[in-house]
Design a protein with these regions (language model features):
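Thiotemplate assembly-line natural product biosynthesis machinery
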Residues: 1-22, 77-81
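Phosphopantetheine carrier-protein modules
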Residues: 15-32, 52-59, 81
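Catalytic nucleophile serine of serine hydrolases
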Residues: 37
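Residues within the DNA-recognition helix of helix-turn-helix
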Residues: 43
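C-terminal structural segments of small proteins and small subunits
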Residues: 54, 60-80
Length: 81
C-alpha cells in the first residue's frame, strides 16, 4: 500500500491545484506548490474518502512537504489494518 498511498496523495494534490502529477515529488514543499491551509483541508477530505480513514486536524496543520503527508497517511492506514 506504500506506493498506492503516495500516488493517492500526489494525485489529489495535482488535481486540486491543476498540476501535472509527474512534476510533484515527495520532497516538494506544499507552500511552493501553492497549497494553502484551506487547500490542505480539502485535499485531506478527498484522501479520507479514498482511503477510508480520518485525518486529524493536528496532522493537517503540521504538514510542510508532500512527504509529511505521505508519512502521516502511512501511520493512519497502519492503525486501521
Amino acid at each position: 500500500m506504500t506506493r498506492q498511498v503516495e500516488q493517492i496523495a500526489i494525485t489529489h494534490i495535482a488535481r486540486h491545484k491543476g498540476l501535472d502529477p509527474a512534476t510533484i515529488t515527495p520532497d516538494a514543499d506544499l507552500a511552493a506548490l501553492g497549497i494553502t491551509s484551506l487547500d490542505a483541508i480539502a485535499i485531506a477530505y478527498q484522501i479520507e474518502e479514498d482511503l477510508g480513514i480520518e485525518i486529524p486536524n493536528e496532522e493537517i496543520e503540521g504538514l510542510r512537504t508532500v512527504r509529511d503527508l505521505i508519512d502521516g497517511l502511512h501511520r493512519l492506514t497502519a492503525r486501521r489494518e
